[in-house]
């Protein structure tokens, strides 16, 4: 059948029909279920409500834009390093995020703010949806270059649901604290993508090996992503934190942790680099692990030193992961991890979760004072000891790994459905499969400006 | 005369003298008329004024930076797609915006805040000036590559005045609501530029056709502009909206609309694409129309579903416009629209205005409650019915199209003045006409690092 | 000895060991001395403290992100113009800033917030540390391409200390006002770097001349830096200014000054350009001097006209500096200034300091009213006359130039230590010395997608 006209037409229509179906279904669900919440609806909001308590909410607004910038500019450009896959990297980032934002508004709405037959949305819904889109884009990094856009939309369809359930179980059923999402975003997104990539393992991928590297200017584009992730990570971790000490502490810890992971990354990259030379892949990725590793604990009393130590550890572990573990992951575990999400999100996410276990276990009424209520409400209310909170945090990590692994496995099976359009082994990491691509250089017909011409214009 | 030394000197001096004259004249007018307003002047502001009402003002501050980012990064980089016109695209964006900001501060100041013989400026003046600069840059997109910098400055000189008057007529005389500027910014900027481009029609433009496309990495630079426009559009539409439900609703509606226009664009681009392949031009532009189409109505009770539907419609219409209408626009209507502003701003702007007519016509006291005063003050005060407001909105669109068309026509005649420097037909879309341009590649003399050399350094 | 295996190993280990040592030492000092301040510590912050006075603090949060964006995106990408040094430009920006942030937190902490045996850190510490990192990156611009990363870290180690002391002397001992840092950041950073570059003078640098220019797309990357600096400069100058009129005025003055410097730059660039063509180097740099020149005075009652005049002057002087003075600086004064920091930060910084002298000398109780206390507290309290404040401002400039020159000289001697790794004259401006660099173009083995292949995928 392959190559027959009808099949080709079917394949050509896959993406448009799926987009139209998903957008149509989402729109119908929005029409039936989604309503503005009381802080967004004209009729429910009153100027007289404008109190300090509401102030808290207004401050969210700039944070939302910071998170938004981080997800789109950051994740989008971090993936353009491939020499012939830049269109797909930023383009599919856009596509996936645009769908994930809508779909997770619905999923999270049903889980968290469904009452009176309606989901109630506001600025917080946007931030939560952006977080979920972040997890989907992390998974995208693992399968980058080896999947078509229709496959990716189906991946997002499944992953958004499991992300929402996992987050609900952790935050609401288990009382786990994870403000910046070391577990819910990074660990979940990374292992979901890695297991999925394992199921989609391509033994013949070396046919596309010559396209798997970067070129000089694609690495510079990638640094745009890196820098935006680096600068906005303090806002990302603090985006849903209540105003005041907690938000300041979260930003400060994240900032210190990133600074230390950067120095750790440079040290290790030069140490293990051929002839002492630095590797751009390490700087682009491992330097960011400081943001991941304090995702769970940045709101806690981690101390500035604790933030530095955590960031440094993450940066070094991640760099070593790129150098030594990624090749093993492919050769022994048959996991082809295009962007190295295991090193940027997987290991640092797990480390971050464990750091959260440790810091939670050390929490005392003395160290947190009145702030205990906002950081560990269940301890403050006497429902849990610090040790019990630590155990719950650990169990949360376990749950996340389960959801991610089972979900990634299911996702892999879904994406293997034979009628789905997937690039052949010899055409992975290649924009031309999905895009009309212009040449790399300007038209050869172009001539330099000649003096006669310059003189004759009107 | 052409080619004679004196003429060449005259042409060389055109840009510097115009810059110096415009800057000098602006500075004199600033010296005579512009003063800090009471929220900016040291002597007029008192700490005791620091009330909730003022809070509203402080919150503007981050929004100002968001709008600023959107106008400069967004519009600047959205136009670098041309393979040999990147310097001019970002450079002239800078030049035009820097002049438009000053000039529109004066024009808008005379129209809106002139009392006691002075214009009073503050943070709101900056946001309003940025909006006006946005409209000028939209018009720039229509004539991109076919006009010199001196011509562009003259275009801005005229357009800023007409923008100010049109906005004044709509918002102050007609009581039209247009928070995000579907009419005042997008429709006005697009049709001003399109009519101007019509007057400047070049029948021989195919002489520069080989330079009219993009190259691989120029398309990636363009995606920087796209992403920044996408992420900051919620702030752009909400920048001048009062705090509270209205601002949240504006951001939320814009966000949903953009998500839907993105999915609609991918669907249609793949559907009409050759061999089912996506076209980067569609993604770079049509995916943004969700922000344009809710410009008038995003503050209204559009409902989340309404935002999705509007965005989807705009994305699909815009994509179809790029595919089918832009060629007709050139061949039949003799409008050469370099960036396709008709598809990104023109049609979506008109659609957005009509959507505003519809949503305004459906406004009820029930749906808006206490919020009616801030969204439709004239309806709330009983001076107008919803239907009457809708009619005023429609008339506002008509006025905008008139101002834009007549203004664009006048602008075209102005730019055709024979002594103005304009690139010849064979040198359109070419940086070398205006800039000292380095080569595309590093010096051929460069040699790879040899081992002996590496070993001999101190 | 050169070229011997042991020496090569020693050189290879320099960067990793220095990174590890500096990170280790910083971490120990953090462990001993650094604590959260009362607005960041869970136990010290109380919800009941949430007053208007605190509000002031919360508003800092978005400004922090703006400053952060400006320092990293702005300075990082402004330096990628060199055709073969993009990795080092953004990479070492990252490295230097990550170290400077930590180290200046300690240095500034000891000088400003050391009590009870501890340094107390919060959001303001982050902004102050970012400012210091900015100065270090300015100095980096002077020596860009001619120094290795270990040398740069040592430079930062010294510069951060002197930056902190100079700032302390100016702001706390002399009562100098310098909100946006014309003196403390720009003048200090520039002359520190220039004197250092003088000490490191390389008579044989023409061996690397062929690598010293830009290529077409590296100039576009640089424009990313330029635009981010331009848009966030109002926030940068206003970041540590108290809320209210002062902050608005600072932003407004900076905005006007930048607009005028942009027009002045275009005018002069076209005027002095070969054949009337614009030079991208001028636009990338001189257009930004409007932000530098009002660094000292933007919070003062400069008036909108004053801001325009100052910006215009800075833009023209800076453009002329690039054209005429930079070559003399190298040939006569033996200062090799890679990025032209003398034109972007040096001269405009000194001009900004002198403008501050003038505006301070003209201060009257009438013009400032109640705002005098926040702008010139010592004049408001009657401890100083306006003339005396002006003299102190002038003396502050003198002190800054002293600290910068002596510091830069010491720094140069430090960096000349013979065992430090430095690129040879023939390998300056070359990434390959420090990085594993991929090719400029995609693998030649890559073939276009053939139809048979496209048809055979699963």
Curated annotation (Swiss-Prot), chains A, B, C:
One of the GO biological process terms: ammonium homeostasis
Membrane topology of the entry: Multi-pass membrane protein
Recorded GO CC terms: basolateral plasma membrane; plasma membrane; spectrin-associated cytoskeleton
Keyword Cell membrane: yes
Chain ranges for the short sequence motif Basolateral sorting signal as given in the UniProt record: 429-432
Cellular localization per UniProt: Cell membrane; Basolateral cell membrane
Positions of the UniProt region annotated as Disordered: 439-458
The protein's name in its UniProt record: Ammonium transporter Rh type B
Organism: Gorilla gorilla gorilla
Gene: RHBG
